[in-house]
């Protein structure tokens, strides 16, 4: 079947990854020892998308866990599902990247890279028909951002025709861990533009807002934030793991979502939003799900989709629901909000429906939008980057690891180009397109 290898890098990547495996294992009824104890053949039908079947009927996640310090690995290993992973797939250094992108990308991370690629190859070789890779990491630290993007380019080099999608946690203004986040994020985005096929931009600020405003949690923990991220990750891959009426896979998603190769940064959303303990006490209708899903409050990136336009979007519904109703609701929402959709891309919303809902819900929906408003997020990082880079603040940490100032300038201009490309397509209209074509023909 179509397998996916999940690589998780750095503290953030591993924490989200570990949580994700808990969610997926629960959906497929795999217990913490790796054995199956479910009652539905659907759970096993495509279990090999994410799991290898080992001897004795054990299921082992196709996960590669990487970090430059042993701490996170220890906590994953001692966590509830720590014994499920293949021990050889834990790869860690001893010294950490110290929030320094250059350490992750050029020095410490590069030394560990060969052993990481060995494990990736081993995982890829045990697949029948490898569909692609998923990478979870944050862009603010050193390991996830620096080493994560290095791994990305190595995978791209070795598996050029496989889809790579990343779940990237972007730094946000309100929730900042380190001063050099803007540097690390800009250098990473520079790499993501070139090497990833699809990037799901998630940021902590939006997750905090969802937790406090929508879920009414008084003090959200990282556990709560990760719960939201995993709901989205699980939703995106549902179609691969369970049968449905309209299926999507990573490649179909990419083909439908990416109108121009550089513009592959999506904002994910999820509905219904529930906190970890209190599952919904009422069943939602398809109409409510659709409404909630397109709501700005449900977006996991801190930018407002109403400030931009949707180039493309995808909605993945889970649960038993009439297809006709889904189609009607999706049509309605596009009809009512037509000004928010790019009019020069007809039928730009893809829908997929999977029959199996997530644990504890009757139905749910995962939303993925390629909206030009995502530029707000990059603009924000870019402004912080410029403010520091003008004064050359903290630069010696990077140049000390052998980096050149030129790289910073390149990364900065690549990110600014991305912002202006989004702006260009936000302003474009169907009529303009025709005029431009005539103009081009005359020039030619």
Curated annotation (Swiss-Prot):
Post-translational modification remark: Some glutamate residues at the C-terminus are polyglycylated, resulting in polyglycine chains on the gamma-carboxyl group. Glycylation is mainly limited to tubulin incorporated into axonemes (cilia and flagella) whereas glutamylation is prevalent in neuronal cells, centrioles, axonemes, and the mitotic spindle. Both modifications can coexist on the same protein on adjacent residues, and lowering polyglycylation levels increases polyglutamylation, and reciprocally. Cilia and flagella glycylation is required for their stability and maintenance. Flagella glycylation controls sperm motility. Some glutamate residues at the C-terminus are polyglutamylated, resulting in polyglutamate chains on the gamma-carboxyl group. Polyglutamylation plays a key role in microtubule severing by spastin (SPAST). SPAST preferentially recognizes and acts on microtubules decorated with short polyglutamate tails: severing activity by SPAST increases as the number of glutamates per tubulin rises from one to eight, but decreases beyond this glutamylation threshold. Glutamylation is also involved in cilia motility.
Residues covered by region (Disordered): 423-444
InterPro entries: Beta-tubulin_BS, Beta_tubulin, Tub_FtsZ_C, Tubulin, Tubulin/FtsZ-like_C, Tubulin/FtsZ_2-layer-sand-dom, Tubulin/FtsZ_GTPase_sf, Tubulin_C
Primary subcellular site in the record, as a coarse category: cytoplasm
One cellular component term from this protein's GO annotations in UniProt: cytoplasm
Residue positions, PTM Phosphoserine: 172
Pfam families: Tubulin, Tubulin_C
Sequence motif: MREI motif, positions: 1-4
Keywords of the record: Cytoplasm, Cytoskeleton, GTP-binding, Isopeptide bond, Magnesium, Metal-binding, Microtubule, Nucleotide-binding, Phosphoprotein
GO molecular function: GTP binding; GTPase activity; metal ion binding; structural constituent of cytoskeleton
CDD domains named in the record: beta_tubulin
Modification 5-glutamyl polyglutamate, positions: 436
Domain notes: The MREI motif is common among all beta-tubulin isoforms and may be critical for tubulin autoregulation.
Family stated for the protein in its record: Belongs to the tubulin family.
Role description: Tubulin is the major constituent of microtubules, a cylinder consisting of laterally associated linear protofilaments composed of alpha- and beta-tubulin heterodimers. Microtubules grow by the addition of GTP-tubulin dimers to the microtubule end, where a stabilizing cap forms. Below the cap, tubulin dimers are in GDP-bound state, owing to GTPase activity of alpha-tubulin. Has a key role in meiotic spindle assembly and oocyte maturation.
Name of protein: Tubulin beta-8 chain
Origin species: Pan troglodytes (Chimpanzee)
């Amino acid at each position: 079947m179509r397998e996916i290898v999940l690589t998780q890098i750095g503290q953030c990547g591993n924490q989200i990854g570990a949580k994700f495996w808990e969610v997926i294992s629960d959906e497929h009824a795999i217990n913490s020892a790796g054995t199956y104890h479910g009652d539905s053949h659907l759970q096993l039908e495509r279990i090999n998308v994410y799991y290898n079947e080992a001897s004795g009927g054990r299921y082992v996640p196709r996960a590669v866990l990487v970090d430059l310090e042993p701490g996170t690995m220890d906590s994953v290993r001692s966590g509830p599902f720590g014994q499920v992973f293949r021990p050889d797939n834990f790869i860690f250094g001893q010294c950490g990247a110290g929030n320094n992108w250059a350490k992750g990308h050029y020095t410490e991370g590069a030394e560990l890279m060969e052993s990481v690629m060995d494990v990736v190859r081993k995982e890829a070789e045990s697949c029948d028909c490898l569909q692609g890779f998923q990478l979870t990491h944050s862009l603010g630290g050193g390991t996830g951002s620096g080493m994560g993007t290095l791994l990305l380019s190595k995978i791209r080099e070795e598996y050029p025709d496989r889809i790579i999608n990343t779940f990237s946690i972007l730094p946000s203004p309100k929730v900042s861990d380190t001063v050099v986040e803007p540097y690390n994020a800009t250098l990473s985005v520079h790499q993501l533009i070139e090497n990833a096929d699809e990037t799901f931009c998630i940021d902590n600020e939006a997750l905090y807002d969802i937790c406090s405003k929508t879920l009414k949690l008084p003090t959200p923990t990282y556990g709560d934030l990760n719960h939201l991220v995993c709901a989205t990750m699980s939703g995106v891959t549902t179609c691969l793991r369970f049968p449905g009426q309209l299926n999507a896979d990573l490649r179909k998603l990419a083909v439908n979502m990416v109108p121009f190769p550089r513009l592959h940064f999506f904002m994910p959303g999820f509905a219904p939003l529930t906190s970890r303990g209190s599952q919904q006490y009422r069943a939602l209708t398809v109409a409510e799900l659709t409404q909630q899903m397109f709501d700005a409050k449900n977006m996991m990136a801190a930018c407002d989709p109403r400030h931009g336009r949707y180039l493309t979007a995808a909605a993945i519904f889970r649960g038993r629901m009439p297809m006709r109703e889904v189609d009607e609701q999706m049509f309605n929402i596009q009809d009512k909000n037509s000004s928010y959709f790019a009019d020069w891309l007809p039928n730009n919303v893809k829908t997929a429906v999977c029959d199996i809902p997530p644990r504890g819900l009757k139905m749910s929906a995962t939303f993925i939008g390629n909206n030009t408003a995502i530029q707000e997020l990059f603009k924000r990082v870019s402004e912080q980057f410029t403010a520091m880079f003008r004064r050359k603040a903290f630069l010696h940490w990077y140049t000390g690891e052998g980096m050149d100032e030129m790289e910073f300038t390149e990364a900065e201009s690549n990110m600014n180009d991305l912002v202006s490309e989004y702006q260009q397509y936000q302003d474009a209209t169907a009529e303009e397109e025709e005029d431009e074509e005539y103009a081009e023909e005359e020039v030619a």
